[in-house]
Amino acid sequence: MTSTRQYKVSRLLQKELGQVFQREGNSIFNGKMITVTEVRITPDLGQAKVFLSIFPAAEKALFDKTMEHHTQHIRHELGMRIRHQLRMVPELQFFLDDSIDYIENIDRLLKQ
């Protein structure tokens, strides 16, 4: 169960990361559209799991390598944006959100 503070911080991070990816995402993912679908934050606000949806879909290995290379830059940009709202910028872990692919697969199976 998440507290009100966790919920507010996760929504703030989701909004600000969306803006960071809107500005920086073009150079990171070569023009692919990036959506921050969800942010889950630990109770101590020290770590955040960020779920991203990329269109057109990216390969998992390429996504992991790209995000590992750019995580510190993204965290720095996020820190510059939220420095007045949060005392500490959480460590970021990025995950590829495949829920849209799962929904499309279920929809395709139901149509058969």
Give the ranges of each region predicted by the language model.
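Charge-rich, low-complexity N-terminal segments
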Residues: 1-47, 51-112
